């Protein structure tokens, strides 16, 4: 059982690392993308702040969705949210949309990311419980 729990923890940490790495690559060029879309420096950084605000606002509610409606449903909502908000991002870039549009879509992208984190955390808690893990989850979630 201890090997199973360690494997689950490793998989969770790997998924978290890969998700963080992918987001880092995206956000590494996002400011340049926003500047190319016609926003000034202040607006571009504010749009990025709205993304963070979206993540802060929606982290707990989307975790509840994963716990009550299921991880698969939460992943589906995250996928749909990110697909629609990414299409909106692209359309806004094409149309040189005003700042308020970028702020709204940035919040929605934050929403999409939180659906994934809530589902992943719900999965690891359930998987560890099923494996008989009796340790402290604080060591995993920090």
Write out the residue ranges for each language-model feature.
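C-terminal ends and interior cores of transmembrane alpha-helices
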Residues: 76, 80-97, 102
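Helical-face signature of the major facilitator-like transporter fold
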Residues: 15-16, 20, 52, 99-110
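Helix-loop boundary and gating motifs at the non-cytosolic
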Residues: 2-57
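Hydrophobic alpha-helix/TM-entry signal in multi-pass membrane transporters
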Residues: 8-16, 75, 102, 140-141
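Helix-to-loop junctions at the C-terminal end of transmembrane segments
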Residues: 58-71
């Amino acid at each position: 059982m201890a090997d199973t729990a360690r494997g689950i923890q490793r998989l969770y940490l790997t998924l978290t690392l890969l998700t963080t790495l992918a987001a880092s690559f995206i956000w590494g060029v996002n400011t340049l993308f926003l500047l190319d879309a016609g926003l000034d420096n202040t607006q571009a950084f504010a749009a990025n702040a709205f993304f963070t605000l979206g993540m802060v606002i929606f982290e707990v509610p989307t975790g509840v969705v994963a716990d009550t409606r299921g991880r698969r449903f939460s992943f589906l909502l995250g996928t749909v949210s990110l697909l629609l908000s990414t299409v909106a991002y692209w359309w806004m870039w094409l149309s040189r949309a005003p700042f308020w549009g970028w702020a709204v879509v940035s919040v929605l992208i934050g929403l999409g990311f939180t659906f994934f984190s809530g589902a992943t955390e719900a999965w690891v808690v359930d998987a560890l419980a099923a494996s008989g893990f009796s340790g402290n989850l604080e060591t995993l979630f920090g």
